[in-house]
Amino acid sequence: MKLNNLFKMQAERNKDLKVLTNLDEYKLNARKLLALNVRVGNLANATKCFKYWEDSETTDPDYILQKYINALSCILTVGMFKGYTDIDSIEIKSNDYCLSDQFLNLYVDINDLLTTSSKDHYITLLEDFLSIGKSLGLTEEIIIDAYLKQS
């Protein structure tokens, strides 16, 4: 997946954000990563993949896509904050793990980025997140189209 334009569009969207002026770089980083954890949790909740009990509720694919795009926006914002916008593209790979394991791995990726921030950890986060999208049946075209439609 090509990321250059997504980073540029996210930068435009972020111009409207009013960031608290009393936050130092550490606190801002921590809050951005906490926000990412929340967005990923919202996505996991939408998929209902965590439920180990019988549930007759169906999942709404449009709602899942919305939550996926919200998390993607947050991931792009973290990448910009960390200065990783020179990543041109990421290959979307299939994953044999169940969806709940993929989400758990994503939380590990976020923690790795918090404790020992590096471009490699960010790339792993992107790869694992895009892999979740593929497991959800989302193609690159669907993801980009939904991202473009998001206000």
Predicted regions and their residues:
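Flexible "arm" and connector segments at domain edges
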Residues: 1-151
